[in-house]
Amino acid sequence: MAGKARVHELAKELGVTSKELLATLKEQGEFVKSASSTVEAPVARRLRESFPSAKSADSAARPAAKPGAPAPSTPATAAKPGGPRPGPKPAAPAPAPVAPAAAAPAATPEAQAPAPAAPAARAVTPAAPATNAPKPGRPTPAAPAPAAPAPAAPAAPAAPAASAPAAPSTGAKPGGPRPGPKPPRVGNNPYSSAPAERPAPRPAPGAPRPGAPRPAPGQGGPRPAPGQGGPRPAPGQGGPRPAPGQGGPRPAPGQGGPRPSPGSMPPRPNPGAMPARSARPAPGGRPGRPGGAPGGRPGGGGGGYRGGGAPGAGAGAPGGGAPAGGFRGRPGGGGRPGQRGAAAGAFGRPGGAPRRGRKSKRQKRQEYDSMQAPAVGGVRLPRGNGETIRLARGASLSDFAEKIDANPAALVQALFNLGEMVTATQSVNDETLELLGGEMNYVVQVVSPEDEDRELLDSFDLTYGEDEGGEEDLESRPPVVTVMGHVDHGKTRLLDTIRKANVREGEAGGITQHIGAYQVLTELDGNERLVTFIDTPGHEAFTAMRARGAKATDLAILVVAADDGVMPQTVEAINHAQAADVPIVVAVNKIDKEGANPDKIRQQLTEYGLVAEEYGGDTMFVDISAKLGTNIDALLEAVLLTADAALDLRANPDMDAQGVAIEAHLDRGRGPVATVLIQRGTLRVGDSIVAGDAYGRVRRMVDEHGDDVLEALPSRPVQVVGFTSVPGAGDNLLVVDEDRIARQIADRRNARKRNALAAKSRKRISLEDLDSALKETSQLNLILKGDNSGTVEALEEALHGIEIDDEVQLRVIDRGVGGVTETNVNLAAASNAIIIGFNVRAEGKATELANREGVDIRYYSVIYQAIDEVEKALKGMLKPIYEEVELGKAEIRAMFRSSKVGNIAGCLVTSGTIRRNAKARLLRDNTVVAETVTISSLKREKEDVVEVREGYECGLTVTYSDIKVGDVIEAYELREKPRD
């Protein structure tokens, strides 16, 4: 093969499959990717040497005669046309074709090899006149036969399309001798009518090559019987072809096409000398023509090359068609223009119209789903069948698209068509995700923070909230009691009395602004018992703190002032305790004050499900006076009795510690400090811990008295030092094996928290609000700094709850625990923000830097003062609202004209006051003629005046020339309207 050969071509040539050839190449160390890859000439030569058996089998398997053809015999004196004869080598001199390697010469006519046959089912019945006798001793070339001979076409007494050459004395005529047979083409031969197993070797360069694109005799297609083909039948000896007139308009033998004799090789007619051919098959080109007229070849092959042949026309005659199965043909003829060829692998499926591939069920299902998919604004979206999609808080459209295998750009465009402007990577709030999911028939389920944290811990093979071990590992622990109630009802005074201390005076404004945790030793039935108390603030801004206190507790003491009754924060505390399924003991405080009515408190609390025992309920009420210390022991006894009766206070102290951060703040000398309540396990110095998005290692633990603690058992509140950052109030504390795990958990929590905060704080902009959103809006940027994280959280929630017009936006760009630093000042200067310090002061040179940069720092110690001032600042940023106030009216009584000032109106002030430079409108017959005019000058007598009151005459000029007698000038001014 010339040049580089492809693997599949070599496989066909060698008679093996491409897979076998690829395996052989791999064994030889040659890297070939696929059957379409090319190989170098040395590699191809080695492959041919590796398959000698295929070549020998090729020659040995060639049949001597196809089924249905008689065996060759010695030539008779009178050969019948169409009779089977062996094809001897013609006696006329002709260029000797080079025989293939598999061909063997025959010494005698009886031992000659069969004539070459095409590898398909072409019918060939060679015949020769009696005068053409084979010459013995002349070798006859034999072409390789196909590996499996195809069955012969229906036998018809017709001469072959190209018979063997005749004797040299016959001369050149249509039935004259033809050049020696050539080997068939390769398997993907477009002129063949049947597939071949493997290609045959090419003829030697000395063999004649046809000049026209028509297939050579013996090559174009299969013949019914092999043989070297005798001479064509003489004129008048054509087979019983049912053509009218035995050949009809066929030319005479001497006038046939310029078919050359063997002596004038290569005498193939050039295309210019050939008769014109039609793209349509001629009448003779229909399949199955049984025979040919005298001097003609068998019926024109169906769909011959560029058209069929005329009835009875020979191969070289005008209109002669190619053998059956040519280009565009089907096996047996009858091809139509545009149809595929019959060669296997050459032009697709053998014969017939182009075949469309069948679609699989999956493709059909995808097409059906695509047709049924919802379209929002022309955008095709996936169709959900009510499936539930779980998304984290603050998820983006890219996260949503990844869950449903969709294009994020399509979701962005769909939301745009729904009136929402969101980018693909922007954190989206829950409502928008649910809206988009509903359009696609998906149920979007936003994962709660608790589920998010549980899934995160599961990924690290950690659990929270369960005791390890069996019942024998559990030990009793002290109860955790939370003191709750309305502000100024005496919660902190009660704890002071219990602790024999004074904490209340240290609170700014006399109100508790953070949670305190203490452990108190008390006696019950002569036994000393430990009780852990948690004090929660009662101000309305500290709702989250009260909720955390209720979740971390075993039992709640509800403090209600006997002289004040049930207040809003009292009801809220009841709801928090009932939501946490926590038993409640009611302490009716301030019974020593005048007007105290404990029975009224019992009646009011009955409405909220707290029925006293004396009324037949199960809630214990204790009347106390925290100021005088009345019935404090009875209250503690009631707490312990309720805890023992309703609760199973046991925990496993031998497991890794788990707890909750009650409070956290940034200490100047110790760094981040967290007040932690241990719920199960034992916390020791040196443990790796993670609480929320903060992590670290326990460096020191301190109790409520300031003493160092080496280990903290369940229900023990301690202050933990060693966090890298300040944890959030209410965050769960967990002990892990390594600092690396703690850092990874904290980083993931921080990322989720940041996404959720971005989705919550970002204001949704719809297309209807786009115009107003593009206008310049006022925005108040704040930086919050506090003494502990719970206070900062409460302050931020309260500030976000301020109801203000959409013209002004409040944005907290940074928050933190500790004093105001220079970094905070630089950020405030860059973003034009105000710094609010709550119970903290500026550190170092932060104050000097703030004065130099012009940054406003506000300090507060009571939370509601900060809220009020921020609300006033927001209202001050609103654009002023003006209202129109009427000043007075003046009627024009006379007109004067002046060359300097124009028209002068002589007026009488009928009501109010007319002022100079005031805005006015001109009325004529109670109709507004000019809406906005200005009183440019005002005179009384001949003196300029500022205003003229009712009942006086005046002269004035206005910035409007078309004034008449009888017009009324109505003066007014615009005054700023205060905001509500």
From Swiss-Prot:
InterPro entries found in the cross-reference section: EF-G-like_DII, EFTu-like_2, IF2_II, IF2_N, P-loop_NTPase, Small_GTP-bd, T_Tr_GTP-bd_dom, TF_IF2_bacterial-like
Chain residue ranges for the region called G3: 535-538
HAMAP family named in the record: IF_2_B
Gene name for this UniProt entry: infB
Designated name of the protein: Translation initiation factor IF-2
Domain tr-type G as annotated: residue spans: 476-647
Annotated region (G2), positions in chain: 510-514
PANTHER family xrefs: TR-TYPE G DOMAIN-CONTAINING PROTEIN (PTHR43381:SF5), TRANSLATION INITIATION FACTOR IF-2-RELATED (PTHR43381)
Pfam (any one): IF2_N
Renumbered residue ranges of the record's region G4: 589-592
PROSITE patterns (alphabetical): G_TR_2
Keyword Disulfide bond part of the UniProt annotation: no
Function according to Swiss-Prot or TrEMBL: One of the essential components for the initiation of protein synthesis. Protects formylmethionyl-tRNA from spontaneous hydrolysis and promotes its binding to the 30S ribosomal subunits. Also involved in the hydrolysis of GTP during the formation of the 70S ribosomal complex.
Molecular-function annotations in GO: GTP binding; GTPase activity; translation initiation factor activity
Family: Belongs to the TRAFAC class translation factor GTPase superfamily. Classic translation factor GTPase family. IF-2 subfamily.
Comp. bias regions, Basic residues: 355-364
Keyword entries, A-Z: Cytoplasm, GTP-binding, Initiation factor, Nucleotide-binding, Protein biosynthesis
Start and end residues of each stretch annotated as G1: 485-492
Gene source species: Rhodococcus jostii (strain RHA1)
Predominant cellular place of this UniProt entry's protein: cytoplasm
GO cellular component: cytosol
Compositionally biased tracts (Pro residues): 83-98, 136-154, 201-216, 259-272
Disordered: region residues: 28-382
